[in-house]
Amino acid sequence: LLTMEFGFCFAKQGGNIMRIVELTDESKNNILENLLKRSPNSYGKFESAVAEILLNIKTNGDEALFEYTKNFDKADINADNIVVTEAEIEEAYSLVDPELIEVIRKAIVNIRSFHEKQKQYSWFDSKPDGTILGQKVTALARVGVYVPGGKAAYPSSVLMNVLPAKVAGVEQIIMCTPPDKEGKVYPTTLVAAKEAGVDVIYKAGGAQAVASMAYGTKSI
């Protein structure tokens, strides 16, 4: 009999609760059925709201982006302060525990090592009749990464999104992450982005940030 074990974590305000579920042949159908109940069909009420945001960003660019940032993040962001400055990054380093910075650096080494093993390479094979077969692997010139914010910092999201792109050879990596009410980004997120090699960091969150990276605005 095939036996698999999965741990499901449930977070609760004021404390953490972890429920360990043993996934066996006898129990897996019931467990998987419960997981599959989280169907995309229930997302319909969000799709229309997101579609409206996408269209507004595509049509109105920065104006819509800054308005959404004000409404959702309560931050006054404009063309002059949307890009995280080197001074802000330096300040972030002064606020993050040096031990945590070392942990981030060790994680970078481990993650890079893993993705290096996944990397594909170009190859070509010439046949006697002149036919050339092969594979040409070319990295994207530019990649946009989105990192959540809100009530917590997610440095792991930075590393897991940025490092595969770096290993692949992407020339420029930009990152969007939401600001707090003061227009600042979590220090840990900034440190992780700097260590991972992000080229430009924008103070923008939500669907409006993803849309801005996809369609482009004057600032992004």
Where are these regions (language model features)?
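Short, basic, glycine/proline-bearing loop/turn elements
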Residues: I31-E33, V147, E195-V200
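Short acidic/polar active-site loop segments enriched in Thr and Asp
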Residues: G61, E171, D199
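Predominant activation on well-ordered alpha-helical scaffold segments within soluble catalytic domains
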Residues: A51, F66, I108, R112, ...
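Short, Lys/Arg-enriched N-terminal segments with co-localized hydrophobic residues
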Residues: L1-I17
